[in-house]
Amino acid sequence: MEAIDGSLFTAKHAGGYAWWDFIKNLRQIRDDGSSLAIPSDSPGHWTAALSAGSRLRLAYDVDLSFAEKLRNGDLRGGLLLGDSLYLVNRALFVMTNASGPKNIEFDLPPSFMIATPWTEIAERHFRAGDNRELTENWTIFGRFPVVGFNQRNLQVTFAFPGVSDYEESLLKPLFEPVLHEYLRIFPQTPATHLFFAFFHGAEDNGEGFLNSTTLTTSDPISPKNRILWTNLLAHEIFHHWNGGLLVPAEDEKTSWFSEGVTEYMANRTISRTGLISTELFLRKLEAHVAMYDYWMWAPPFQKTTLEGAGGDKDFNRPAVYSGGVVAAFCLDTKIQTQTGGSRTLEDLLQLMMQRYGLTGKQWGSDNLVRDASEVTGVDLSDFFRRYIRNREVLPVKTCLGDAGFDAALSDYAGEPFITLQEHPSLTARSIRARLRGRNAR
């Protein structure tokens, strides 16, 4: 490897892992083939003896026993999954201060596959742009299912280490309709290649890396819990656009939008594409309305607004996610009623993509108010002032009624019941039809 000095180091402590603990027997290989042990001079750091500008040849072992046991947070480190091994690359590499690309070559059994976001430059030979791209991603080795998607400028690779053949058969039909729908919503999507790993872990969780994303579920993948895993995958994929390309300048103030709009669009998408029934979509919407209503009513949350909830996303999860869904639904419905159905929340997202996603600019709360008002054709600052920046309860019944649904709500008990209106207005019928999609069942 290239070296500008004798400094050697691993990635910094992250995800509950001290990566240097896994590096064993680090040694420098001399020109004559002999080796010289390099002792650690501090956690995660060694110093090799060499002249400036020299190339350095190292050998070391990596103790992967940490990946043998299921544990919370294993998606941030590694996990052995039957015939495959998922590893966050921080566990593998000792680095130098030399800048520039890093070439990686693997010597593996011929039957083994490799999935990684690094650029493949030859068979089993890859290139990472720098130390960060080298380590802040994952690699999967072994035998595992892979699903690919390639349309227009978007290429996506989904890897499923440890997933059974039956589970694979359930997962595969999800990706194409979801991604087609997202590309329809964002036709301006710039060229990119996304990498997702999805497997059974100790918890239901997700972790984003530099060029890759990992999702884990603690439950089996089955038709009975389809709403859970379809929602999880559709939600995290949508974050490529909302949160990945549309980057907020004030994350704490806009978490309700980043998470709530993402959750709303994910649920709407799996309903519109026929992956779940309208009944399941309504049950999911009921759950979000229930959590939002309870959050608005319960004493521990009385001093928090939707805008302020992002300051403690875990504690205020009912606001950030469920409240965000209700706000997104009401905003979508308001845009459609004000424009006679000619504009929707999609138009707002497309405008934001044009102004921020494609320019690299971040957006703030004031930008959102301005953009939403522009799309709707009326000033929506009062909507954001009352329901987002202050604690006035969103008009859930009105929003649902405008979309062709009846609702019975009991705020203090968190018990909403949503049903289809028997005789909706023409406007409500069209809003409901757009929500349910062609493939609604």
Give residue spans per PLM region.
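Beta/coil-rich, acidic/histidine-enriched accessory regions frequently appended to metallopeptidases
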Residues: 1, 357-441
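Ligand-binding face of N-terminal immunoglobulin V-set domains in extracellular IgSF glycoproteins
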Residues: 3-15
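Extended, low-hydrophobicity, Ser/Thr/Pro/Gly-biased non-transmembrane segments
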Residues: 14, 59-141
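A surface-exposed beta-strand-loop module
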Residues: 17-76
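Zn2+-dependent metallopeptidase catalytic core
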Residues: 19-29, 63, 90-91, 99-116, ...
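Juxtacatalytic substrate-recognition/specificity segment
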Residues: 145-254
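Acidic/His/Gly-enriched intrinsically disordered linker/tail segments
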Residues: 250-325, 338, 354-359
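Pan-zinc metallopeptidase signature
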Residues: 298-370, 378-381, 387-394
